[in-house]
Amino acid sequence: MGERFKDPAKNFVCSFLNCKASFSKAWKLEAHYCKHTGLRPFACDRCDKTFCTRCQLTRHNLSHSGKKPYQCLEDGCSESFISTAGLKNHVERVHQHKEKHYVCDYEGCAKEFRKKKQLRSHKCEHMNQLPFECQYEGCGKKYTTSKKLQKHEKVHDVYPCAEEGCDFQGRMWTEYQAHRKAAHREALQCDSCAKVFHKAWFLKKHKLFVHLGVRRVFKCTKEGCQKTYTTHFNLQNHILSFHEGIRSFICPHDGCGKAFAMEGSLKRHAVVHDPQKKKLQKKTKRGRKKKLEPKTNVSDDSELPAQLHGLSLNTSTSQNNP
């Protein structure tokens, strides 16, 4: 029976039973463990997404701000990227015109591949070699690449529901998450207006900002700047456009060319070129129920309900101009 090729440089080996995966870096092994445990401990505080590593979360956070810190330095090029890998690929492909080709030297073949591992996998087909074997008991299926084997191994993995009395088992993590949201989603009701939330943090914020009138303040962290904002979006927009001069989102409308630091700002600007969108928005707003008027701002934490006592809030006057 065939065995997996083992790279001597991959010193970080998975300790789970029947798993032979190994990695060259500790963080890659840590991310791999998520496959076995189903845990994704790094959660985004701006959306519902979760990640296996802090690096993945940091890269994801850039999608909210629109910030692309790695800029191409080639003359006349204004492209920027969220990672060094993206920048490197851009430079090699666009400016250096590098196209790597790996040619099969098997007699009568001469097929070309962009990646060396693709060629290596292809040669295994010529020699009828299937070096990557599934180690799950009673299976024994073999594949030409580790990627194909990993894809196959997912049929053996299941994610059992942790709720008592529920026998659901997801074949994929996304399937398990969808089940959790559909069947076991927690419903938290506001005792002041009966509005329902699915996360305790959102309910707390709702009570503070809607019923108690508290306004959260985000202060600019740049030295010498006293600007404050009531939303994280406005603060990010201020820092990117005013302090760092980054405006990555450009209006595609002919003859416009205005640039914005945040994607949301570009979308709002698009109404200028398409007034019909504004009419539709107004029509939608008129159909909504009128929101409750917030109470006077609360400036003393002692007036907050006991369950919100631990929150640290700044209730000073805010400014909203970048």
UniProtKB/Swiss-Prot annotation:
Residues 312-322 have a biased composition (Polar residues). It holds the Pfam family TFIIIA_zf-C2H2. One of its GO terms (biological process) is ribosomal large subunit biogenesis. GO terms for molecular function: DNA binding; RNA binding; zinc ion binding. Residues 272-322 are annotated as: Disordered. SUPFAM superfamilies: beta-beta-alpha zinc fingers. PROSITE patterns: ZINC_FINGER_C2H2_1, ZINC_FINGER_C2H2_2. Transmembrane segments: none annotated. It is found in: Nucleus. Its main location: nucleus. InterPro entries: TFIIIA_Zfn-C2H2, Zinc_finger_trans_reg, Znf_C2H2_sf, Znf_C2H2_type. Involved in ribosomal large subunit biogenesis. Interacts with the internal control region (ICR) of approximately 50 bases within the 5S RNA genes, is required for correct transcription of these genes by RNA polymerase III. Also binds the transcribed 5S RNA's. This is Transcription factor IIIA. It comes from Ictalurus punctatus (Channel catfish).
